[in-house]
């Protein structure tokens, strides 16, 4: 398993991380024996980053991950969790953040995590359940730093969802160590310019900003919430199709566009669409680790097999770029 140094943290993190989210659902709603089997297999092949959040199953993901790690006692496991601050707590961010992490640590059975990510979307002016860049830098950061000084988290992170200008501002402030970034075959604008008229949010080459600031990148929505699996079928324990992040305005449109990328399979570049999506995500050097949702140990094995084949060859990336140009001019 390839490892990459995660930004300025100097942590050697496996390029494939273990996602404990609610979309795939294994660590939220899976059978305990399947959870243990998948985590044990991940550790066996050298996966060392585990990503969870209190929002995943209202704490179930953290609890289940904590149980399994306590049983398996890995020599090295980096754990990241998150806090989503509700609007009613925007007037007490310091306390809300501290209380959330304390709850997470209790569920995980740990005295600290390696990365503590803000889960809220970040916008220029805030509003609703989003935080403004100003709120993040002036209120969230000091609260996070207090927890860092107390030893409850080693590093600070954001979820890079929201308005592009605000995300650039927060990354450029050089105070966060990690950013979870949506990056997939339907929207690669974190890495490259979007063609004019392309129907997706333009992340404005966010990777240029993370690399300059020494921010490690966790790739999320690698399979676009399931759209890039190439099938409408979802495992019984998986979540319903989630709202897209950064790509189309609805999941059905993402599904339709994903089907138009199938020439990658038919022309022999890859064995399957999810393989293409997974290998695409690790093809950029700014990527520190990627998270692929899973409902079963078998789905984990499929993601693992794809990563072990390595990044997509340049010919496949060129073919993908040509296919994606077909989306230009369509409504988002």
Task: Please report, for each region that a protein language model flagged, where it lies by residue.
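Active-site groove signature of glycoside hydrolases
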Residues: 105-130
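Alpha-helix-loop-beta-strand connector modules within alpha/beta enzyme cores
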Residues: 63-81, 137-150
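N-terminal binding-site loop/beta-alpha segment at the start of enzyme catalytic domains
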Residues: 1-77
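Conserved, mostly hydrophobic/aromatic
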Residues: 6, 18, 50, 65, ...
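Acidic (Asp/Glu)-rich catalytic clusters
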Residues: 8-10, 66-76, 105-111, 170-174, ...
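Acidic-and-aromatic substrate-binding clefts and catalytic sites of carbohydrate-active enzymes
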Residues: 26-30, 53-62, 86-95, 123-125, ...
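Beta/alpha (TIM)-barrel catalytic core signal, keyed to glycine-rich beta->alpha loops juxtaposed to Asp/Glu
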Residues: 121-331
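Short, acidic/polar
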Residues: 29-42, 92-107, 162-170, 277
């Amino acid at each position: 398993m390839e490892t990459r140094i995660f930004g300025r943290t100097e942590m050697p993190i496996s390029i494939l991380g273990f996602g404990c989210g609610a979309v795939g659902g294994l660590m939220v709603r899976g059978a305990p024996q399947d959870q243990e089997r998948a985590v044990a297999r991940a550790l066996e092949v050298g996966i060392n980053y585990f990503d969870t959040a209190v929002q995943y199953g209202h704490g179930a993901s953290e609890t289940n991950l904590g149980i399994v790690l306590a049983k398996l006692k890995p020599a090295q496991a980096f754990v990241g969790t998150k806090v989503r601050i509700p609007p009613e707590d925007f007037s007490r961010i310091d306390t809300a953040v501290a209380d959330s992490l304390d709850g997470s640590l209790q569920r995980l059975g740990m005295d600290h995590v390696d990365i503590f990510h803000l889960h809220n979307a970040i916008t220029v002016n805030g509003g609703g359940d989003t935080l403004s860049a100003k709120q993040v830098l002036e209120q969230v950061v000091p609260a996070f730093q207090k927890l860092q000084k107390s030893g409850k988290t080693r590093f600070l992170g954001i979820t890079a969802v929201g308005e592009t200008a605000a995300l650039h501002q927060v990354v450029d402030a050089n105070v966060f160590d990690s950013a979870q970034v949506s990056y997939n075959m339907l929207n690669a604008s974190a890495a490259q310019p979007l063609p004019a008229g392309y129907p997706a949010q333009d992340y404005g080459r966010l990777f240029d900003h993370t690399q300059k600031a020494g921010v490690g990148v966790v790739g999320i929505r690698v399979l676009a919430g399931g759209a890039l699996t190439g099938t409408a079928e979802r495992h019984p324990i998986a979540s319903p199709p989630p709202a897209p992040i950064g790509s189309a305005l609805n999941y059905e449109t993402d599904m339709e566009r994903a089907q138009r990328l199938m020439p990658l399979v038919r022309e022999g570049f890859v064995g399957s669409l999810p393989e293409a999506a997974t290998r695409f995500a690790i093809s950029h050097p700014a990527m520190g680790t990627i998270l692929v949702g899973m409902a079963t140990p078998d789905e984990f094995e499929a993601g693992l097999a794809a990563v072990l084949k390595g990044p997509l060859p340049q010919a496949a990336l060129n073919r993908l770029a040509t296919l994606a140009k077909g989306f230009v001019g369509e409504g988002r």
